Amino acid sequence: MRALLKKDFDTLTKHYKMYVILLVFFLFAGSVSTTDEFFSTFPMVICSWFTANLIAYDEKQEGSSASGRKLYVQSKYLFQFITVAFSMIVCVSGLSSRYGVGSADFCNVLLMMLAAAFLVPAVMLPIIFKNSAEKSTLKYLAVLIIGVAMCYYFSAAFEARYIAHISLGLVIAAGLLMLALYFLSYRLSVKYYEKREI
């Protein structure tokens, strides 16, 4: 597992430097921005780009299943989780200084970040592992666009109606539910990938 993760990080920094630079830019912008929620949530979407592009790179190199298919899927989900966790730590530190931990605005943006971090890849990765990254490009982009649009739409609707009642406990409960869906997505991806002909 460690070797697979190291390979992914090496591939990312060697072949996808622009994505890394883009992530750093948005992490910095998200940590200092005083109003725009987009800069706080978009880094989570970029992390999904990382994972999808790494899978596509592996498929071109014909080395995606060299270490066993289940272990390979595990490494991609763990890589996604690590990059998202790092990004969230940076962005949440900015949110806490901007809004204050536990405030309604803080909880609302954090909820949107969690959705972008876990719901988008939970839908996207099984599609990729079932069909291959190349065949799933349009579906992947559709999931990203729809997912981000839904995050903003429901966030705005939620904020307008319930923001006064949102609490950190509710956000934590929602986050745990999203993690459970992320785990179910992993199980589904393993099932699809083990059955797929390569």
What is each model feature region?
Residues M1-K60, Q74-I198:
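Hydrophobic alpha-helical transmembrane segments of membrane proteins
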